């Protein structure tokens, strides 16, 4: 089953399709975001706020979030620990 992770302001992404969550300050990341915007494969989920995390998806899409990368990573890890506990309890 696909698990959805909240990336802020009611926006969610499929946790199983996330490749990386990175900070947008580095020049190569800025170029990657600009290229994605130019090609139409960028999803801006910041609701007008400053972008603090760039989520790279398996599909090649880039998702911009106003949450910190650490916050998104904690939410993904929290989902994984809940899943592993459910599997352990089923045994």
Swiss-Prot record:
Disulfide bonds: none annotated. It comes from Lachnoclostridium phytofermentans (strain ATCC 700394 / DSM 18823 / ISDg) (Clostridium phytofermentans). It holds the Pfam family RemA-like. This is Putative regulatory protein Cphy_2880. It comes from the Bacteria. InterPro entries: RemA-like. Belongs to the RemA family. Coiled coil: none annotated.
């Amino acid at each position: 089953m696909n698990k959805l992770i909240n990336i802020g302001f009611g926006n969610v992404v499929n946790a199983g399709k996330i490749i990386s969550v990175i900070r947008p300050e580095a020049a190569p990341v800025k170029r990657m975001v600009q290229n994605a915007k130019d090609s139409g494969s960028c999803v801006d989920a910041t609701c007008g706020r400053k972008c603090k995390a760039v989520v790279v998806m398996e599909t090649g899409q880039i998702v911009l979030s106003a949450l910190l990368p650490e916050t998104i990573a904690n939410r993904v890890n929290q989902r994984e620990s809940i899943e592993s506990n459910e599997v352990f309890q089923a045994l």
